[in-house]
Amino acid sequence: MTDAPVSRIRNFCIIAHIDHGKSTLADRLLQDTGTVANRDMQEQFLDNMDLERERGITIKLQAARMNYTAADGEEYVLNLIDTPGHVDFSYEVSRSLQACEGALLVVDASQGVEAQTLANVYLALENDLEIIPVLNKIDLPGADPDRIKEEVEAIIGLDCSKAIPCSAKTGLGVPEILQAVVDRVPAPKDAVEEPTKALIFDSYYDPYRGVIVYFRVMSGRINCKDKVLLMASKKTYELDEIGIMAPDQKKVDELHAGEVGYLAASIKAVADARVGDTITLLNAPADEPLPGYTEAKPMVFCGLFPTEADQYPDLREALNKLQLSDAALQFEPETSSAMGFGFRCGFLGLLHMEIVQERLEREYDLDLIVTAPSVIYKVNMIDGTEVMVDNPATLPDPQKRESIEEPYVKMEIYAPNDYNGALMGLCQERRGEYLDMKYITTDRVTLIYELPLAEVVTDFFDQMKTRTQGYASMEYHLIGYRKNELVRLDVLINGERADPLTTIVHRDKAYNVGKALVEKLKELIPRQQFKIPLQASIGSRIIASTSISAIRKDVLAKCYGGDISRKKKLLKKQAKGKKRMKAMGKVDVPQEAFMAVLKLNDSP
């Protein structure tokens, strides 16, 4: 049993945009409270995936318990729950916020408020969290704390008179932050005697002990000898151990309301202990689960194929293992005439897709070909049924379908005023519908647009950063489906349809996209000994075509002068060979060609 009374527990998280110093601040808090000895300290202590350290982002949630002696001489338990800052992982963020009573809002004193910070702040306000503004990086020469305070007050409406200036790098202001957490974050509700409910805010897969679940006890208590029931998945488990993260796992006998801990119960896969599920006791279950549980739905799909056919079983095993620790990843087998066997995978967003792909290549040593990402389309058939299509190649024939609907998102882009025109141009190109424009401060603006998700998942983010020299940031959420004039654009290479290059585009853009695509492929596919026609088609109608000319071997090199009929015979023989080659020959399409769909920046 941990001995902290509920009144001396503080649960808080850190909200920050990528690169505003969240993980560094977490490091300093751990160091200042003596939770991690100075000699054990390494940068970004809570980001324990190599990929997280390299990209400087937090992907999986972590939690750490710190003991802190406050100014009043009492010892407090501070539970820091780390949150991912990226838009793809917003569901995980919302669950971790539910486990807290307060949040540190970290804003870079030289850059100001960014889109993802805002999205998370609104989530925190919905959960009634006490928000403490922290201005980080005040040791930088470009820092302007007064301007940033005004900005936070203008945009979020928070009172910044008590904002804490700090530098997580040097440790300046960290003791004040710890004291502010004790003074300003409310203690958890004292609900020890109520029926047991605990919220799962994260889980990860341990190859030896099964799934380790991180949870926050909302009411009641959990003992290490209890049998528990997970209310959403209806599964029951006998606990092997429970404990606290300090920040390494430490076993305890019991945890009560307000505390944060972990449990191990030989759970086979993360999908059995979903983030947001409610843990209760089997012999005295709660009447209803905690609110807000939803299953993470994939938004972006792509095909993953091994470059070598014999790696297919390895890819399947790697995906199975990854799914144990990533419940949002979905996959099913698919075959393609051009690529052989592979998998169709579903992801939360583009970043999630990149991370999964990188982990497969890095941790499982696989060489992969990845097709261009697509979204889920809703196809209304003539017979009145609805079909959901996540692979453009499987779109039903035009004769059978009545209309196609595509997902739309509402997007907010935050950027300096100077880049207004460039951003509006980009949104216009991507079939965006203008909703509103708000001036946050005299030189920063918010653009609000509605766009088709398909236009966002390709290279929208890269383009936005390029056109604004990296200053813009965006945040979007799904708002539903809308009917549009959409067609399937097929690419034929040497007369054969290349499934991975099939895309669904708006009818008005089809010709330009088709033309740009075949031109791009012409650059990327190496020349062969025979001529390769490249065509883009809608149904049976070819809308754009070009061809890669053959490499010609000079068969007349050995003929010095002499009879013309001899030369004709050799040329005829060569033409015959090329004809046979063209009929039999397979064209090797390099990986870059499959990503060509993404890089059609020159298409309007």
From Swiss-Prot:
UniProt name for this protein: Elongation factor 4
PROSITE patterns: G_TR_1, G_TR_2
Sequence positions that bind GTP: D19, H20, G21, K22, S23, T24, N136, K137, I138, D139
Broadest EC class assigned to this enzyme: hydrolase
InterPro entries xrefs: EF-4 (IPR006297), EFG_III/V (IPR035647), EFG_V-like (IPR000640), EFTu-like_2 (IPR004161), G_TR_CS (IPR031157), GUFP (IPR027518), LepA_C_sf (IPR038363), LepA_CTD (IPR013842)
A GO term, aspect molecular function: GTPase activity
Organism of origin: Synechococcus sp. (strain WH7803)
HAMAP family documented for this protein: GUFP, LepA
Organism lineage string: Bacteria, Bacillati, Cyanobacteriota, Cyanophyceae, Synechococcales
Compartment list: Cell inner membrane
Assigned GO CC terms: plasma membrane
Domain tr-type G: 7-189
Catalytic activity: GTP + H2O = GDP + phosphate + H(+)
Function: Required for accurate and efficient protein synthesis under certain stress conditions. May act as a fidelity factor of the translation reaction, by catalyzing a one-codon backward translocation of tRNAs on improperly translocated ribosomes. Back-translocation proceeds from a post-translocation (POST) complex to a pre-translocation (PRE) complex, thus giving elongation factor G a second chance to translocate the tRNAs correctly. Binds to ribosomes in a GTP-dependent manner.
Predominant place of localization: membrane
Similarity annotation: Belongs to the TRAFAC class translation factor GTPase superfamily. Classic translation factor GTPase family. LepA subfamily.
Keyword DNA-binding: no
Keywords from the UniProt entry: Cell inner membrane, Cell membrane, GTP-binding, Hydrolase, Membrane, Nucleotide-binding, Protein biosynthesis
Documented EC number(s): 3.6.5.n1
One Pfam family matching this protein: LepA_C
UniProt record, GO biological process: positive regulation of translation; translation
Membrane topology: Peripheral membrane protein
Taxonomic superkingdom: Bacteria
